[in-house]
Amino acid sequence: MLDQNVVKQHCRIDTDFTGDDALLTLYTGAAAHYVQTWTRRTLYEKEDSPGYVDDPAPILLNDDVKAAMLLLIGHWYANRESVVVGQTVAEVPFAVEALLQPYRIYGV
């Protein structure tokens, strides 16, 4: 969904290094799932993606969504455990939610 080289650049990984490609692919899929779960909408790469036309509330992979996904991926890549010792605490999901807020569908 996101270009692997863009993900690597965001994570400050040399684009020629392939040792973490599977991990980055996993994080990219998890970030896309996070977007869909948080917004309660199906994420589509482009308008001609299968299902987009028939979806009553689709969300496109626009710059806001890409930035949110990159923030999540970068956070997960840098912090691979649930607790980080010796670091200042910063809530990355808040920045992600700020980017995704305009696209969220609130329940009935």
Predicted segments, located by residue:
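Divalent metal-cofactor coordination and adjacent catalytic microenvironments
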Residues: 1-108
